[in-house]
Amino acid sequence: MLAATVLTLALLGNAHACSKGTSHEAGIVCRITKPALLVLNHETAKVIQTAFQRASYPDITGEKAMMLLGQVKYGLHNIQISHLSIASSQVELVEAKSIDVSIQNVSVVFKGTLKYGYTTAWWLGIDQSIDFEIDSAIDLQINTQLTCDSGRVRTDAPDCYLSFHKLLLHLQGEREPGWIKQLFTNFISFTLKLVLKGQICKEINVISNIMADFVQTRAASILSDGDIGVDISLTGDPVITASYLESHHKGHFIYKNVSEDLPLPTFSPTLLGDSRMLYFWFSERVFHSLAKVAFQDGRLMLSLMGDEFKAVLETWGFNTNQEIFQEVVGGFPSQAQVTVHCLKMPKISCQNKGVVVNSSVMVKFLFPRPDQQHSVAYTFEEDIVTTVQASYSKKKLFLSLLDFQITPKTVSNLTESSSESVQSFLQSMITAVGIPEVMSRLEVVFTALMNSKGVSLFDIINPEIITRDGFLLLQMDFGFPEHLLVDFLQSLS
C-alpha cells in the first residue's frame, strides 16, 4: 500500500530546492483522496511480498551455556522465504503526519540451514547441520511520512512494527533430540524477530523510494516530447489530511533544457474536493508556457497539398464543384497548396466559459495556373479568438469549439488583382473549414501523443475537464494501474 500510494502521488521531480513554508505556491497541484487509496490498497500483497523476498536476511549466530552440554554454538544460515500470503490490509491518513498502513496475518515460511556444535563430557566434539523451516504469522504496522527532497517525493517509515503471533521452528525429519528444538525455538526467537523486523522494514522503505523514483522517471517521459519537457519539481512537502494527499509542483515548461523560472500563483485547497479519486489543478500560466514552447519549436503550423486539401474541404461539406472554386484553383485542385502558421506566440487564458486562445495567423493559398509556369498566391493575416472546451472519453481527447471571432488584418494577392468575391470566398473557406480542421487535427495529435506515452493503458473513469477563471481542473476516478505495478516489479528483478 505504501509503495502504491507513492506510485500515484509522485508525479515528477527534477533537482530543485523545496520550500519549507506553509503557503501553497504551484503551477500544478495533484490531490489523491481516500477512495483512491482504498483502490490502491488492493494490491498491497504484491508490494509487501516483494519487500519480503528482496530483503537480505543475515546469518544468525551465537552460543548458549547448557547444563550437561556446556557451551553450545549455533548458527542459522542461508535464510530464505519459501512461502508468503497476506490476509488483509487497511490504510488511514493521519492529519499532518503520516500514512498509516496495517497489514494483518502475513503468513511467512522461512527456510535455511541450522548448524550447531558442542563438546561432550568426554571431550568429543559434536557438529551437526540440519535444514530447518520457520513457520511465522506476522502483523505489520507501517507509518509513512512523505517529504520533499531536492524537489522529489521521498518516503520515510520511522515507525515500522512487526508483531509475531507465531514463530515455530521445524527441524528436518525431527531426527535430533527434543532439547535441540526447544533450545533454538526458545533462545533464538527473540534475536530472529529483531533481525526480521530490521530487514523487512528497511526493505519496505527502500522499495518505496525506488518506486517513487520509478514513477517520477515515468512521469518525466509522459510529460515530455522532443525538446519540450515539464519541470514538476515539488515546491514543498506533500500535504496529508484525513481525507486526501496533496502535492504542489512548479509546472514550468522546459525547452531545449532551459526552463523559465516564473513566479508561481498561490493555490487555495478549497478549489479541490475530495469526492473523486484524483484531482489535477493547472494554473493558466502552465498553458501560457505550453503555447510559448510550442511556438518556439515550430509546431504551430499546418500545410495541405493538392488532393489532401480538396479532401479536407469535402470532409467539412465544402462544395468543390462550384464555379468559383474551379476559378480560384485554376483547374488544378490537385496542385493547390495551403499553409497556416502563427505569426507570434498565442495567448491562452482559462475562463469559466472555456479555454480562450488568442492567436495571430497567416493563411497562404497558392494556386497554379494552366501554363504551369505561374501561380496565384493569396495571403490573409488575421487575429482569431477561439473558446474551446475539452473532454476525454474512450481513450480519446475531444475539443469542442464553443465560440470564435475572426478579425481580418491584411489581405494580399502577390501576383494579380483579385476580386472581392474571390477574397470573400477564401475567407469563408477559412471560417467554415480552416478552424474546424485545425481543431480536429489537434484532437488527433494530442490523443496520439498521450497514447504514445501510455495514457491509454490507464483505466480512467468518468473524467471531467472543468475551466474556471485562472485555472483548469481535471478530476476523475480510476482503476488500479496494474501495468505500472507490473513494470515496476519487473524492473526489480
UniProtKB/Swiss-Prot annotation:
Signal peptide: 1-17
Record SMART domains: BPI1, BPI2
Alphabetically ordered keywords of this record: Atherosclerosis, Cholesterol metabolism, Disease variant, Disulfide bond, Glycoprotein, Lipid metabolism, Lipid transport, Secreted, Signal, Steroid metabolism, Sterol metabolism, Transport
Tissue expression remark: Expressed by the liver and secreted in plasma.
Pfam families, per database record: LBP_BPI_CETP (PF01273), LBP_BPI_CETP_C (PF02886)
Molecular-function GO terms, alphabetical: cholesterol binding; cholesterol transfer activity; lipid binding; phosphatidylcholine binding; phospholipid transporter activity; triglyceride binding
GO biological process: cholesterol homeostasis; cholesterol metabolic process; cholesterol transport; high-density lipoprotein particle remodeling; lipid homeostasis; lipid transport; low-density lipoprotein particle remodeling; negative regulation of macrophage derived foam cell differentiation
Known outcome of mutating residue 215 to W: Reduces triglyceride transfer 10-fold. No effect on cholesteryl ester transfer
A single cellular component GO annotation: vesicle
Entry keyword S-adenosyl-L-methionine: no
Chief localisation class: secreted
Localisation per UniProt entry: Secreted
Consequence of changing residue 299 to C: In HALP1; reduced secretion into plasma
Result after altering residue 218 to S: Reduces triglyceride transfer 10-fold. Slight reduction of cholesteryl ester transfer
Positions glycosylated per UniProt: 105, 257, 358, 413
Catalytic activity annotation: cholesteryl (9Z-octadecenoate)(in) = cholesteryl (9Z-octadecenoate)(out); 1,2,3-tri-(9Z-octadecenoyl)-glycerol(in) = 1,2,3-tri-(9Z-octadecenoyl)-glycerol(out); cholesteryl (9Z,12Z)-octadecadienoate(in) = cholesteryl (9Z,12Z)-octadecadienoate(out)
PROSITE patterns reported for this sequence: LBP_BPI_CETP
CDD domains, per database record: BPI1
Cystine bridges: 160-201
Family, similarity comment: Belongs to the BPI/LBP/Plunc superfamily. BPI/LBP family.
Disease: Hyperalphalipoproteinemia 1: A condition characterized by high levels of high density lipoprotein (HDL) and increased HDL cholesterol levels.
Function of the molecule: Involved in the transfer of neutral lipids, including cholesteryl ester and triglyceride, among lipoprotein particles. Allows the net movement of cholesteryl ester from high density lipoproteins/HDL to triglyceride-rich very low density lipoproteins/VLDL, and the equimolar transport of triglyceride from VLDL to HDL. Regulates the reverse cholesterol transport, by which excess cholesterol is removed from peripheral tissues and returned to the liver for elimination.
Designated name of the protein: Cholesteryl ester transfer protein
